[in-house]
């Protein structure tokens, strides 16, 4: 999945989830810097039947899902899944009196698997989804805004006047063909994805009419990964792969300045900064000013990667390398027309007109070599210690959200007959890291206690960082911080003292700071990196009680807590989310053919924020979901 916007989807009938931390450049086609999450769904060759799910919860939320798994022959199986979810919303927009976070999501999946006795396997998964959302629960996080004695918006208030929404349609197909020979296997993994989305935003998120955005994007993505792999169980194992991808996107992103935005962002700035110099006064009579920006964004790349594994008694040495190349380009077209008036030395206003119609193409090619090495000592099949070193890399890109800022600045300067000296804000450079990790897995009490731990150090150069330029800017941009470092530890423990009781806990600590980053206005050395939680903690206990009633099955009591914080929101470290805890609990009646789950989430009603951003100098945070209750019924036929 090349587009991160498509992560928001339904994981229907997930059988297991595998998480691989850190850079993964020699196992899979697409290079990753932060890790890989593999989701494995039920196979129609190993499971047959019909699965139904019905759920209702707080916020007028409901979910329906139906799956059918069947074999057409011993070697051919198919599965068809359909789903629909609806959320009425939890947060009110005080300006409109309506819920601002409603959502509707529907889609389906068709999975086909075929095997033969000659070592050939074919898997194909076709899926589609359609998403429709309201606006966003963005609460104002600054001092109360008061104009002419009237409060415009208060701290903590969600209140904006212009429509906001998001819709997306996605179609994807993944085909895997694998052949198992006597000593190795070869796989071809081909994927295609089409996405079409449109976002409409009140970008100032206040009751005033500053400016709005409509961003419409269409994208096609094609990937191919060919992997040769030796079979397990040998002293020496190897993997060799070749990967290529092509992605092409087009985007329209017009920004419409409204009356307040025209006066405050264009006219006022022009008069204060340029009018005083030229002894002129500027005015605009229009109530709306559109700034149009169109983009075409083709990206393609390829890689060759290899990994070797050598077993020497209890020792296992793994070494890998990847050669990665990526070409990214941006063709843009920006245009606007503005009528305004200028009066010189108190004279009569004279009408004038500015027309901007310009375009260009920017392109970058990135090449990188990514090595990886690890050493593991196995005490037995479960217990081990390991150390690993890997280089991570993330390609650069373009700041499409800054084009409206650039265009409005050009308007302001051309009002005074001057040219705007355009800064190099359009692109950002790649990010590089070295990841060092020491960890292990352990087990005791005949497997009743299992766990893993890791300590890590990450040295990052040119870290890609989302920032909000100073002043009344209308966009956000990605920039490169000089150098950062992260040091921390993670541990997880599973404890099953009895067959009926299972306890799972996990804790993580991260100290992520700037080592070198100066934006020309302030030095952020030793400040904490935004959006990186200092602590994460989760704990869950499940107790299974047999009822002895055949039609009822077992009763499973579950309780847990999820915690995170502190999370700093900006480079200055002036705003943060303190440590918070979300308590969950459920009672489940579990039978062979059905389960009934009565659950509650965030039982303590914790108030917390999950996102932060700035617009025209104002700070906003996105509210996390409040206390919710619900009931879920699963039926297996």
Residue positions per predicted region:
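Membrane-embedded beta-barrel scaffold of Gram-negative outer-membrane proteins
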Residues: 176-181, 185-201, 384-390, 401, ...
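Outer-membrane beta-barrel translocator/receptor signature
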Residues: 12-15, 26-93, 98-108, 119-120, ...
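Short loop/turn motifs that connect adjacent beta-strands in outer-membrane beta-barrel proteins
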Residues: 44-49, 73-76, 118-119, 183, ...
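Gram-negative outer-membrane beta-barrel transporters
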Residues: 229, 235, 239, 311-314, ...
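Solvent-exposed loop segments that connect transmembrane elements
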Residues: 91-99, 136-159, 204-211, 254-292, ...
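Periplasmic-side early beta-strands and strand-to-turn transitions of outer-membrane beta-barrels
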Residues: 46-47, 55, 67-162, 195-210, ...
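C-terminal beta-signal and adjacent terminal beta-strands/loops
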Residues: 393, 562-570, 588-637
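Short acidic/polar hinge/loop motifs at secondary-structure boundaries
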Residues: 1-21
């Amino acid at each position: 999945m090349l587009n991160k916007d498509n992560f928001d989807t339904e994981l229907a009938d997930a059988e297991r989830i595998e998480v691989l931390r850190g850079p993964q450049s020699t196992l899979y086609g697409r290079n990753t810097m932060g890790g890989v999450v593999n989701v494995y769904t039920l196979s129609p060759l190993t499971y047959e039947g019909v699965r139904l799910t019905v759920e209702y919860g707080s916020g007028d939320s409901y979910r329906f899902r139906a799956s059918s798994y069947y074999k057409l022959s011993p070697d051919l199986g198919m599965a068809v899944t359909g789903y629909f979810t609806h959320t009425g919303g939890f947060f009110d927009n005080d300006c409109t009196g309506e819920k601002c976070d409603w959502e509707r999501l529907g889609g389906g999946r068709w999975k086909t698997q075929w095997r033969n006795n000659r070592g050939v396997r074919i898997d194909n998964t076709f899926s589609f989804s359609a998403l429709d959302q309201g606006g966003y629960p963005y609460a104002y996080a600054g001092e109360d805004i008061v104009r002419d004695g009237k409060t415009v918006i208060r701290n903590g208030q969600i209140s904006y006047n212009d429509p906001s929404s998001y819709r997306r349609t996605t179609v994807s197909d993944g085909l895997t063909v694998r052949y198992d020979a006597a000593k190795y296997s070869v796989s071809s993994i081909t994927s295609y994805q089409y996405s079409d989305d449109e976002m409409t935003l009140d970008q100032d998120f206040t009751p005033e009419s500053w400016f709005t955005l409509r961003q419409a994007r269409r994208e096609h993505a094609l990937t191919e990964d060919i992997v040769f792999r030796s079979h397990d169980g040998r002293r020496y194992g190897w993997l060799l792969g070749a990967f290529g991808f092509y992605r092409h996107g087009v985007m329209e992103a017009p920004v419409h300045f409204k009356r307040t935005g025209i006066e405050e962002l264009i006219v006022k700035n022009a008069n204060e900064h340029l009018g005083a110099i030229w002894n002129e006064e500027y005015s605009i009579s229009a109530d709306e000013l559109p700034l149009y920006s169109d983009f075409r964004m083709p990206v393609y790349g390829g890689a060759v990667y290899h990994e070797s594994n050598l077993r020497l008694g209890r020792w296992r040495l793994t070494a890998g390398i990847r050669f990665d190349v990526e070409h990214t380009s941006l063709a843009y077209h920006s245009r606007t027309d503005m009528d305004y008036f200028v009066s010189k030395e108190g004279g009569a206003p004279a009408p004038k007109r500015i027309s901007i119609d310009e375009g260009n193409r920017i392109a970058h090619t990135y090449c990188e070599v990514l090595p990886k090495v690890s050493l593991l000592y196995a005490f037995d099949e479960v217990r081990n210690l390991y150390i690993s070193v890997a280089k991570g890399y993330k390609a650069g890109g373009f700041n499409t959200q800054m084009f409206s800022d650039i265009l409005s600045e050009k308007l302001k300067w051309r009002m005074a007959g001057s040219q705007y000296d355009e800064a190099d804000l359009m692109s950002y450079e790649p990010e590089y890291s070295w990841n060092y990790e020491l960890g292990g897995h352990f087990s005791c009490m005949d497997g009743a206690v299992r766990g893993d731990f890791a300590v890590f150090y990450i040295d990052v150069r040119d870290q890609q960082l989302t920032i909000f330029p100073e002043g009344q800017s209308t966009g956000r941009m990605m920039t490169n911080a000089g150098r950062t470092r992260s040091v921390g530890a993670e541990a997880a423990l599973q404890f099953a003292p009895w067959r009926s009781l299972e306890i799972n806990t996990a804790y993580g600590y991260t100290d992520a700071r700037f080592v070198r980053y100066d934006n020309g206005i302030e030095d952020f050395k030793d400040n904490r990196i935004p959006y990186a939680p200092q602590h994460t903690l989760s704990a869950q206990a499940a107790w299974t009680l047999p009822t002895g009633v055949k039609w009822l099955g077992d009763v499973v009591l579950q309780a847990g807590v999820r915690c995170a914080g502190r999370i700093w929101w900006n480079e200055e470290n002036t705003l943060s989310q303190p440590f918070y805890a979300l308590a969950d609990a459920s009672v489940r009646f579990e039978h062979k053919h059905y389960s009934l789950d009565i659950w509650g989430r965030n039982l303590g009603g914790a108030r917390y924020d999950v996102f932060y951003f700035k617009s025209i100098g104002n700070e906003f945070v996105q509210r996390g979901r409040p206390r919710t209750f619900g009931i879920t019924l699963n039926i297996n036929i």
